Curated annotation (Swiss-Prot):
Quaternary structure annotation from Swiss-Prot or TrEMBL: Heterodimer of an alpha chain and a beta chain. Beta-2-microglobulin is the beta-chain of major histocompatibility complex class I molecules.
Species of the source: Ictalurus punctatus (Channel catfish)
PANTHER family: BETA-2-MICROGLOBULIN, MHC CLASS II-RELATED
Protein name: Beta-2-microglobulin
Domain Ig-like C1-type: 24-111
Lineage, highest ranks first: Eukaryota, Metazoa, Chordata, Craniata, Vertebrata
GO cellular component: extracellular region; MHC class I protein complex
Length: 116
């Protein structure tokens, strides 16, 4: 088992060393249509990035929202990676919700649009 795990880790890092740098594609949305005052789930899906060194934060009015859950790092064809982070939230008209993604030396902030 240890040998297999070591082999997989070595294969991922060896192959990723040859992959080209790629900035992330970021999508911010909610599980259900946005409705002020109703509990929902805020989701930030980040895909097509390489290398896998990345940080995702979900923010409410510029502050990190606690208790957010993140999927395990997964890779796609061409050694590009994807991650999803989500958290329960109750939107109000006064709050701004954002997904902040740090990849390599760049930081991007994408706001959630409530579609109301």
């Amino acid at each position: 088992m240890k040998f297999l795990l070591s082999f997989v880790v070595l294969a991922v890092f060896s192959a990723s060393a040859f992959a080209k740098e790629s900035p992330p594609k970021i999508q911010v949305y909610s599980r259900n249509p946005g409705e002020f005052g109703k509990e929902n789930t805020l989701i930030c899906h980040v895909s097509d990035f390489h290398p896998p060194d990345i940080t995702i934060d979900l923010l409410k009015n510029g502050e990190v929202i606690p208790n957010a859950e993140q999927t395990d790092l997964a890779f796609e064809k061409g050694w590009k990676f994807h991650l999803t982070k989500s958290v329960s939230f109750t939107p109000t008209s006064n709050d701004k919700f954002t997904c902040r993604v740090r990849h390599l030396k760049e930081t991007k902030n994408i706001s959630w649009e409530p579609d109301m």
